[in-house]
């Protein structure tokens, strides 16, 4: 039986964090969801379901005004909002459905804490806190990246500079960490590595909008990633090749590896 259930829009690299961790530490994670545009036709709940066409109206007892990335009417049960006060996805639940866990790194932590087959969260409270430090730094980067990636067509000079600064600060820290140890937080693989792979792989998708950015006078922020952060690139590609990662990420990074002429070995 699953140890964690997640409802989200799909595909979602942030959900992949929990799935990869589950693969490594032996935790079954159930994921239910749909394309972002379709979530307005779902009842958001511990047991989510698609609504019938005649149920889709603003007078439905669970109709709510969409916020943060969703417009129009959404359908969220009272129990969903009790478990998830911010009403966002991905939304995770314990097996009983009475405890909600939100924010992808917190969901990732939950999987690591439940998992017994492999320790992904440090050998003692100090190592765990160091891992948390990287997760917090990752969150700052990911928040800035989300704003940038959601509106390439209208990115401003100020927004571009903010994203560039966040990128350089985050990547320089990861590069420095990897100069001292084989994994981001130390000698062992941890959820810090998993979070990095998923969020940074998503950021690299800016490459698909190169022409849009050029039309606005901007170059790709990650254009010189290979040369400026070689250890970070090597770490990203190395983890992507591991079965626990590749079965979740699939071909998500293939376009980028092809661009850099990185072969599958």
What positions do the PLM features span?
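GST-like domain detector, emphasizing the conserved glutathione-binding G-site
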Residues: 1-164, 169
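A short, structure-level motif marking secondary-structure boundaries and short turns
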Residues: 2-5, 219-222, 264
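A generic structural-conservation signal
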Residues: 31, 187, 248-249
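C-terminal/domain-terminus segments
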Residues: 36-40, 247-265
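Short beta-strand element of the conserved SAM-dependent methyltransferase core
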Residues: 92-94, 239, 262-263
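GST-like fold's C-terminal all-alpha helical module
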Residues: 122-241
């Amino acid at each position: 039986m699953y140890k964690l259930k997640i409802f989200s829009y799909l595909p979602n690299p942030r959900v992949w964090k929990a799935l990869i961790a589950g693969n490594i530490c032996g935790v079954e994670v159930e994921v239910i969801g749909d394309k972002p545009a379709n979530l307005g036709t779902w009842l958001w709940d511990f047991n989510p379901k698609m609504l019938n066409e005649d149920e889709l109206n603003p007078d439905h007892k669970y109709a709510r005004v969409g916020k943060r990335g969703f417009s129009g009417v959404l359908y969220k049960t009272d129990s969903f909002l009790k478990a998830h006060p911010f009403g966002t996805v991905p939304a995770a639940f314990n097996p009983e459905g009475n405890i909600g866990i939100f924010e992808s790194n917190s969901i990732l932590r939950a999987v690591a804490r439940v998992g017994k087959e492999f320790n992904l969260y440090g050998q003692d409270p100090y190592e765990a806190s160091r891992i948390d430090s990287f997760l917090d730094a990752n969150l700052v980067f990911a928040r800035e990246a989300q704003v940038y990636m959601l509106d390439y067509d209208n990115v401003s000079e100020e927004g571009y500079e903010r994203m560039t600064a966040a990128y350089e600060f985050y990547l320089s820290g990861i590069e420095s960490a990897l100069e001292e140890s084989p994994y981001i937080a130390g000698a062992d693989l941890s959820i810090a590595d998993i979070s990095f792979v998923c969020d940074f792989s998503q950021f690299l998708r800016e490459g698909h909008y190169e022409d849009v950015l050029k039309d606005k006078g901007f170059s790709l922020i990650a254009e010189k990633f290979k040369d400026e952060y070689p250890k970070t690139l090597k770490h990203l590609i190395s983890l992507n090749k591991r079965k626990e990662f590749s079965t979740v990420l699939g071909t998500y990074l293939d376009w980028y590896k092809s661009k850099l002429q990185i072969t599958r070995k």
